[in-house]
Amino acid sequence: MRVSSIEAEMENPIDVDKTDVEGELKIKQVTLLRENIVKKIVFFLVAIFCSDRPSVLKKVFYEEVSKQEEATHVYVLASDLTDYIEEASLKENPEEGGEKSIYFVNRLQKYIYHKKQNKFRAIEYFIQGKSYSEIANNKPLATGRVDQLLAYYGKSEIEINVPSFLTLMWREFKKPINFLLYFGIIVWGIEQMYVSTAITVVFTTTINSLICIYIRGVMQKLKDACLNNTSVIVQRHNGQGYQEITVASNMIAPGDIVLFKREVTLPFDCVILEGSCQVTEANITGENVAIGKCQIPTDHHNDIFKYESSKSHTLFQGTQLMKIEDDILKVIVVRTGFGSYKGQIIRALLYPKPFNKKFQQQAVKLTILMATLLLIGFLSTLSRLLDIELPPLFIAFRFLDILIYSAPPGMPMLIAITNFVGLKRLKNNQILGQDPNSASQAGRIQTLCFDKTGTLTEDKVDLIGYQLKGQNQTFDKIQCQDPNNISIEHKLFSICHEVTKINNKLLGDLMDVKMAEFSTLDIDYDHEAKQHYSKSGNKRFYCIQVNQFHSEYQSMSVVCKEVDMITKEFKHYFFIKGSPEKIQSLSHVQSSEKAQLSTLINEGYRILGFGYKEIPQSEIDAFLDLSREQQEANVQSLGFLIYKNNLKPDTQEVIKEFKEACYNIKVISGDNPITTLKISQELEIVNRKNPTVIINFEETENVKSHLIITEIQPDNSTQVIDFSSAQNEQDYINKQMSYCCDAFLNNKSFCFSGKAHYYFQLKAKTDHISFKPEWVKMQDKSVQKIISFYQMLIINTNVFARTQPEQKQTIVRLLKESDQIVCMVGDGANDCSAIREADVGISFAEADGQFSSSYVSLSTSLSCVKRVLLEGRVNLSNSVEIFKGYLQVALLRYLGFLTLAYFYSSYSSGQMDWQALASGYFLVYLILGCNTPLKKLEKSVFDDNLFSIYNVTSVLFGFTLHILSIVGCVESLHASPIYKEVNSLDAENNFQFETQHNTVLNFNILINFFYVIISNHIGKPMKDRYYKNTIAIYYDLGLIYTCKCMILQVLLILEHTHHGLIFLILLLDQEFSSSLTVQVYFSLPMNLFLPEEFSLNFTQEVKKEKELLICNSSSTILEVDYNLRLNYFQQNF
């Protein structure tokens, strides 16, 4: 073993090479760091507080180094601009002759430094770029070599470490937001408010425990879904020769040659060396259909292996091996663990994209504003506190309370628990939520993007029949023919697919199965020739080569060998089927054929074109060696297959409700523009009474290509808009942009094709244009105009057709960049990347494909989207409600503290407990989590911007009202004949708790709690009315009864009472221990609560101090002597 020389200095930061094992979680740069242990020991609290701020930790506790042996950690900057600090070590790099290189793990993916390229690179088995012949010539690994590879690549398993409950609790408790809580607990402890401290600790621990239990449950479920420990047969070299041994699947290393002899769930990604099979990739794509896989073509020895173009030869981890066509399937393992395709999906789930923190950022700013107001209040009373010689420690407490009450630490926990309750409600409705952060985000959704097939429409399709080109007759069945002389289209229907027969049942893509059934020919497999075939009479039609369907080609094709089993004569055909536009582009099409296609599409059918060409016997070997593009050139179009794809039963009703609620609805489909438009018109997403503009593109050789803009009238007549008068390319773009702007203003609908996306992608490549927001303003005006044109089309278009998976992701990303909150709904197949890109993703797939989405519906009904949106509105409104209410209550309590300190008093520990627990700014907001969503979506104009005029005004109004109520209570008390003044602290130089100020302000706060809860409540259109929350109503009634406010019994009108406003004072026996003596209720205008004849009496000022008005249960008014008052209260309280 050779040891590397690692003394050479390295540049910081170091770039990271792209690989095929990172998936979406890529990293850009790595910086070598050395940890300063002394600083971490001295400033360990800072290290904990900044644990989620790697950039801060880097500056404080680490220093950059340029030598590998000096580095203890690395600073990682990811492609999504998140950053991490990871531990680093030296590891042998077998790709560089065993030299030691610096190595680290980021988000479960291993990276190692490559000296030759001066780049870091994710650890992967090198196969991409190798020729098929090189791969086919791989030999079994030596037994000793396997152990080295396992140490380098890791075990072949997706091992998800479910953190222990205590580990998760520690993560929760060390979040920076909780440090305010700890600060508050320390202050409360010094102030000897032990019960209040205990209540806070218990509630915090309980809420965090529930959250941690939920997280563990989700992770355990994911871990169970990833477990796939099985036994496999592997070929190894033991020094004397090759042998077949059975080992556990997790002990397989990349490069191992494995033999499959039975059906199994694949535990790794592998490439087929020998044999063919049928698999279902439902665990990956969400589509439970049989897919044929075959061995790599050994006769194409110079062809290069690429994962994207070699899917027909690649088996992915998690797929189910349904049928092995021959006795054995020989494969070479290429990707394992989190580097496999499934592993990449799981990594993306475990490390989701950073969510929008706008609400949190606004909350911090509003908290600072409130803290400023409290500081002003504190400073305004400071001179008084100093004049009465209040001990400095007490003044310090009041100052420190600013931090506690302006940024209540329990607030994030309350918001989290309401989100948790929302997820549980969704689970009861067969909707699984993966990310609690998306619970409130669903309430902000503005734009809904839907895949068409399987989402808006049913998964199943019906084959109506077919038409031959130039004929308008639709054949709903194959015409009777001589079985030994069937038509060319009959041959094509029977073999141009990847359908297989398992247990006498045809399995495969639904459209392929329908076509194969339509052909009526028997389908089988020839074990000797190792080929699928169909048969009719004496003829067999063998499939000798398959070009699988790919979104880039929009077609699938086969090379067919027709054999007469009696005469042994044979012919060769090339059959192709796919999008009709694709087939027409490959053949010479007459205008009549285009009109025929247009007629079929306008009837709303889903159309496949099909064609063929016969291959001369002398050319067949050369033809098989041609590329796919060359094989598909110059085919002869035959006609069209006609399918009908019906809407789901509830689609129309649900979409109508979305439209009435003013959501921006977009359909993003891979189907052709006209079919997608017809579905959109049927759902009234597009107004069929208005013209529709289709944006398309056709690349033409030797001619400068531009967008093709076609306008379709309501009567289905079409017109290609002519821009030939443009003087140059920029003028051409300006004219097209001007036309589109006018079309938008005239309420014309737009359909944007995938080829139009390709036009802008081509523009970006040839003209060096960047569509990234941070680069837009740095480019010249002509370029900015193109970017604006593209963005304008994406934002204003409602129908996207012939869209490839990566284009769907681009659409969602551009919508997000235009400040829209986007929800993507798909079936989990070609929509995974777009679903993950969206702010909220919803999938219908009951498979591992579901893990790309925030929510997974176990039913196929579109109503699940409605439920998610309704629940999101509840969570969002609860979050705003809790934030505003919790903050107002905290401010109210702090103002009470300041006021009481002004009069040598403070709240007792018991009163603090009562305020915090029974009166409920804690319990009540927990109960608010039980607010239920509405039954129907309504138009919402809810603004969760905490700095909106309404929200700021309501908070400031509440703040003002609280101050006025405190002033009113104190002034009323001072004017009362029973007022007793307190002029000093108690004998032990502590606050006095048994004072009238204490009781008055305590009851004032309790009553104001109800005002805060009710005034901040957000009902329709976000959630049900407050009175429909049964638990909250009963709880409130219980508090009212406890406070003796259920029945108004005594009203005392004081001299200074303003007309129309009353103070309701309930007197209690002063000997009632240290409890409450006077309750003051500052109400709204009394005529809202009392009959008119009473209002007339109450608005008169009563100047006799000993006159008392008692309103009993029979609503009669009595005048009694003041002495009777105490007797009355002694009997009734």
From Swiss-Prot:
Membrane topology of the entry: Multi-pass membrane protein
Segments in the Extracellular topological domain: 29-34, 191-193, 384-396, 907-915, 973-994, 1051-1101
Stretches that traverse the bilayer: 7-28, 35-53, 168-190, 194-212, 364-383, 397-418, 888-906, 916-931, 949-972, 995-1018, 1031-1050, 1102-1124
Compartments where found: Membrane
Catalysis: reaction(s): ATP + H2O = ADP + phosphate + H(+)
Annotated positions binding Mg(2+): 827, 831
GO terms under cellular component: membrane
PROSITE patterns: ATPASE_E1_E2
Molecular functions per Gene Ontology: ATP binding; ATP hydrolysis activity; ATPase-coupled monoatomic cation transmembrane transporter activity; metal ion binding; P-type transmembrane transporter activity
Entry superkingdom: Eukaryota
InterPro entries named among the record's database cross-references: ATPase_P-typ_cyto_dom_N (IPR023299), ATPase_P-typ_P_site (IPR018303), ATPase_P-typ_TM_dom_sf (IPR023298), ATPase_P-typ_transduc_dom_A_sf (IPR008250), HAD-like_sf (IPR036412), HAD_sf (IPR023214), P-type_TPase_V (IPR006544), P_typ_ATPase (IPR001757)
Keywords from the UniProt entry: ATP-binding, Magnesium, Membrane, Metal-binding, Nucleotide-binding, Phosphoprotein, Translocase, Transmembrane, Transmembrane helix
Cytoplasmic domain ranges by topology: 1-6, 54-167, 213-363, 419-887, 932-948, 1019-1030, 1125-1133
Keyword match Metal-binding: yes
Active site (record annotation): 451
Family annotation (Pfam families): E1-E2_ATPase
CDD domains assigned: P-type_ATPase_cation
Documented EC number(s): 7.2.2.-
Keyword Translocase: yes
Protein name: Probable cation-transporting ATPase 9
Organism: Tetrahymena thermophila
Taxonomic lineage from the root: Eukaryota, Sar, Alveolata, Ciliophora, Intramacronucleata
